[in-house]
Amino acid sequence: MAKKQFKAESKRLLDLMINSIYTHKEIFLREIISNASDACDKLCYQALTDDSVKLTRKDFKIDLSVNKDARTITVTDNGIGMDKEDLENNLGVIASSGSYKFKQEVGDDTKDTDVIGQFGVGFYSAFMVCDQVTVRTRKFGSDTAYQWQSSGADGYTVTECDKSDAGTEVIMHLKDDTEDEHYSEFLEEWKLRELIKKYSDYIRFPIRMAVTKTKKVASCMSDKPDEVPYVEMETLNSMVPIWQRKKADVKPEEYNEFYREKFHDFADPQRVITVSAEGAVTYKALLFIPGTTPFDFYTKEYEKGLQLYSSGVLIMDKCPDLLPEHFRFVRGVVDSPDLSLNISRELLQHDRQLKVIAGSLEKKIKSELAKMLKDEREAYETFWKNFGRQLKYGVVSEYGIHKDLLQDLLLFWSSTEKKLVTLDEYVSLMKEDQKVIYYAAGDTVDKIDKLPQLEALKDQGVEILYFTEEVDEFVAQTLRSYKDKEFRSAMDGASDESAQEKAKEEADTHKDVFAFVKETLGDAVAEVKPSTRLKSHPVCLTAGESLSFEMEKYFQLMQPDSSIKAQRILELNTEHPAFTALENAVTADPEKAKIYAKLLYDQALLIAGLPLDDPSGYTDLVCGLMK
């Protein structure tokens, strides 16, 4: 028995592959089982095309066994097997894939099979955890069996052996444990179950293992039953993925159970989205919109992405490239036989197929959300409560490139409707002479509703959108307009010519009072002017056009040391008794007028939700008036 050397610069290539190509040692089992699945698929295909092969898909299986004393894991299949030439070509030449050649030979006729292998290197991943691998195989239709054995880069041997049935068994002898690596865990039943469930759950053939269980039997010595151990062959994998089944054949509770188990959620999903695409790229997808917001969703720790499978084999647990950032809340799986994988089958090559799938999924998710908004408003508002903020972030991100896609999905509170409305609903209810979309920002709907700056618009029956999240004003700035109607803050002041003319008259009539207040407050305010919007309140603060008070609060929250501040424009209601008292004091008692001016400014700060410049000074002023 002569030892043969691997071909193709074997020592360097095998060492490179073992230490560089794969990043997770545990995937060795995925690769060996995928090879076994390919072997079964090849014989299954032969049975479909050759009447002399009396086998059906139900006849095939993959068995997994462990010998802890010998430190071996054995994977056995009853697939097509190999002869001596196959062993030389497939295992003696690194990076020679028999499965790939098979797919090339039969072409489109493999549509009913799930042949996985492409590169011919997966088998050698076993050497990441093993110091010796033995392959015993007999090709279907042959009377001779062969044994291939290797300890790695030193070469391999091929000899005849005894094997009664067609198929292949791969016997992997695990390395000894080290301080850094605990290879013995791969001999444990729980670990093997975990790996099968994680990587090979949807292999289309049963993966079986002899499992020791216990059952209760009546005891002749005690009233309590005895627990007697017994061994049972248990199928570890699901075989048929739920996303491969027809939607009509799957009950809603099955989808819910799959979601909860797969994504470790206690709540059912709010929405289930199924996709089956054929064409340039063939794939199936099963997507879920969660029923609740994940606790870490709005944190940096949250990882977006869909589980990615290739022909039922897990390739990536979370593939971020399949979801745009604005739909990062979606969970689910994508399975495609058309993906261009890299040599380790761990990472996806960034290619056209992936982009096509991602683009298609984005359109599908948008379509489902739009349908929910139209037909199930209450359900959509529940979704909006959970993930609406993410859609807003999507509008403002990447310089607004996604705004046209997302703008019709947005909801804001309406001052007149007293409920959430879309931008389209707002525009459809606008007065004929209204040229802009008004909005007002604040911490809560109640606080915004009480803002004195809104009194005039409310009296006119103008609808105002209430912005209660820090991102809302950035959304308005990014959109700029909707259906040719520009966004305008309700805090911006008079917009019609008559109101502007009246403001000019008031400013001229009371110019001494405004000048006095400005001089008293100094740089605390940029301007003091008459208000055209106040009705029952004496004073309010408005901001300049570049930055609002809510944006100032946001920047202060993000950067506490930030010096960015909105302009402070003090508006006074010339028809309010407080203004009359101020005007009289300017002439009769300038010192008291200064107190009035400071009090009015502090009141305006409080109404705007801004911190007082001098809280102690404010209380002193109030107490002074009470003497």
Roles of regions detected by a PLM:
Residues 1-186, 194:
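GHKL (Bergerat-fold) ATPase N-terminal catalytic module, capturing the glycine-rich phosphate-binding loop
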Residues 115, 136-155, 175-627:
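GHKL/Bergerat-fold ATPase module in large chromosome/replication-associated machines
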